[in-house]
Amino acid sequence: MTLAASETLRPHEECVPVPDAFDAGLWFIGRIRTPWAQRAECPRRGDPVNGPDCRIVLDARWLSALEGVAGKDRMQVLYWMHLSRRDVVRQNPFFGDGSLGTFALRSPLRPNPIASSLVRLLRVEGNVLTVRGLDCIDGTPLVDLKPEFGLLP
């Protein structure tokens, strides 16, 4: 049992067995530094205007991949919600009294707990990006960075 699997389910929630093996691999390319130590402290949605400054610390090997990023205003940040359960298929959201399928929600409980936030880029200093608009716990693994969809280099 993993740490996340020990969480108590809400009424009307359902789990399934997860596969024994993964279909693909990925590398975490850095870590996200935020003011929140626990999921309960995180906002439900990041605020790119009034949210706190957060830092994305990219592994030094990927430094050259930041070329051209400093000129961007907004970035899409993809990250791995590493403490989330991966076996929940029906959930009882905080705003309702009944269950919905996981794919109908933006909950962190997902088979592949990938999250996406559109953030405001404040500055780039070496391998550290300072941004606003994140909603994850401190130390969350970084999966990828992309410019806002629709913007060309």
Regions found by a protein language model. Give the residues of each.
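Glycine-rich, low-complexity intrinsically disordered segments
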Residues: 1-118, 122-153
